[in-house]
C-alpha cells in the first residue's frame, strides 16, 4: 500500500513510478497525496486529480481481502483560490456519501483498514475534529468491529490506540502514521527527521488478527530501535528511539543480561543521530530535527 506523494509535483513521471512498482512484482494499492495533485489548475479540484486517475485509477475505491475491508480514499482538499499549494484535510461531501454507500455492503463484524494520505483520526499536533466532515465519516465507521487508520504525509512515525481521555467518537480505533520510506524530505539519506530509519511497515493479517513491525532498509526485522547512552543524551539518561512504539504497550522495561535495570518513561526528544546528520547538511530545505514521541528514557545512577 502506497500512502501518497508518489511523484512529488512532477506529473510527467507517473509512467516512471508505474515502471518501478511493476518491478516489485506484487499488487500495489495507491492513495493520492497532496503532491500527486495538479496544483496549477485553478478551476476545480476534480481536475487536479486527472493525471493521477489516468495513470493509477480512482482516488476512492475499496476491496475485500479475507476478513478485512480495505478503503483507499482521498482526504486532501485543495481550495483552488490561487496558484499556491493551499489545501486542508477531510472529505468532500460527495466523498463522504461514497464512503457511506460503500460501507452499506460491509458486514459490521468486518475489520476496516482505511488508508488516506493525511491522518483522518489521531494526529500528533493538530485537532482532527477540524477536518471537513469529521463527524460524518467517524459515524460511518463507528459500528465496525475494529478500524485501522493508515496515513503518511506528516513526516514522522506515530501510532496511537484510542483511549477514553482522547475521545474521537471511535473507541475501537488504532491510527498509524508512517514517515517517508526514503528518509528526510529532499535529503533521502538514511534517517527521517524524527530518527526513524528508511523503511516501511510490514503488516501481517491472519483472519482477524492484525500485527505489524517496522522493517528498516538493509536490516532484519529484529532491528526495532536505537538505544543512546548517556553521553549522547546529556549525561543523565539512557534513551531509546523505538520506531513502532504504541501507547497500548503499557510499561516498558530496560533489561541487561537478564536483569531488570530500570523502568522506561515516555519522553519527547530530538533524535541524536538525525541532529548530527542535519548539522552536516548544506541544503537546509530538508526537515529540521523534530521532537518525536516514540522515545523512551530511563535515568541512571552509575557511570555508563
Identify the residue ranges that each predicted region occupies.
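Extended low-complexity, serine/threonine- and proline-enriched intrinsically disordered segments
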Residues: 250-277
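Active-site glycine-centered loops adjacent to acidic/histidine catalytic or metal-binding residues
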Residues: 4-5, 33-34, 117, 151-153
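N-terminal active-site segment of His-dependent metallophosphoesterases
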Residues: 1-15
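Short acidic, glycine-rich surface-loop motifs adjacent to enzyme active sites
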Residues: 3-4, 103-125
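Aromatic sugar-binding surface patches on proteins
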Residues: 271-303
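Binuclear metal-dependent phosphoesterase catalytic core
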Residues: 164-257, 297-304
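Short, well-ordered beta-to-alpha junction loops that form the rim of enzyme active sites
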Residues: 75, 115-120, 153-154, 215-216
Amino acid at each position: 500500500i502506497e500512502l501518497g506523494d508518489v511523484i512529488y509535483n512532477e506529473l510527467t513521471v507517473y509512467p516512471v513510478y508505474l515502471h518501478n512498482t511493476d518491478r516489485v512484482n506484487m499488487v500495489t494499492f495507491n492513495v493520492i497525496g497532496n503532491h500527486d495533485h495538479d496544483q496549477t489548475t485553478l478551476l476545480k479540484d476534480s481536475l487536479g486529480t486527472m493525471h493521477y486517475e489516468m495513470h493509477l485509477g480512482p482516488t476512492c475505491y475499496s476491496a475485500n481481502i479475507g476478513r478485512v475491508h480495505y478503503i483507499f480514499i482521498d482526504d486532501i482538499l485543495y481550495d483552488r483560490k490561487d496558484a499556491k499549494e493551499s489545501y486542508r484535510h477531510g472529505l468532500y461531501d460527495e466523498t463522504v456519501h461514497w464512503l457511506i454507500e460503500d460501507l452499506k455492503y460491509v458486514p459490521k463484524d468486518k475489520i476496516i483498514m482505511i488508508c488516506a494520505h493525511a491522518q483522518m483520526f489521531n494526529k500528533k499536533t493538530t485537532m482532527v475534529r477540524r477536518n471537513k466532515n469529521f463527524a460524518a465519516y467517524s459515524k460511518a465507521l463507528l459500528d465496525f468491529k475494529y478500524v485501522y487508520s493508515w496515513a503518511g504525509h506528516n513526516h514522522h512515525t506515530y501510532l496511537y490506540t484510542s483511549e477514553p481521555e482522547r475521545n474521537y467518537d471511535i473507541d475501537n480505533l488504532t491510527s498509524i502514521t508512517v514517515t517517508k520510506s526514503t528518509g528526510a524530505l529532499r535529503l533521502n539519506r538514511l534517517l527521517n527527521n524524527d530518527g526513524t530509519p528508511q523503511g516501511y511497515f510490514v503488516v501481517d493479517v491472519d483472519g482477524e488478527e492484525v500485527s505489524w513491525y517496522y522493517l528498516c532498509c538493509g536490516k532484519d526485522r529484529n532491528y526495532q530501535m536505537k538505544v543512546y547512552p548517556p553521553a549522547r543524551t546529556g549525561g543523565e539518561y539512557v534513551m531509546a528511539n523505538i520506531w513502532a512504539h504504541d501507547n497500548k504497550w503499557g510499561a516498558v522495561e530496560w533489561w541487561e543480561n537478564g536483569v531488570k535495570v530500570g523502568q522506561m518513561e515516555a519522553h519527547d526528544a530530538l533524535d541524536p543521530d538525525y541532529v548530527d546528520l542535519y548539522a552536516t547538511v548544506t541544503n537546509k530545505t530538508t526537515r529540521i530535527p523534530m521532537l518525536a514521541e516514540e522515545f523512551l528514557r530511563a535515568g541512571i545512577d552509575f557511570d555508563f
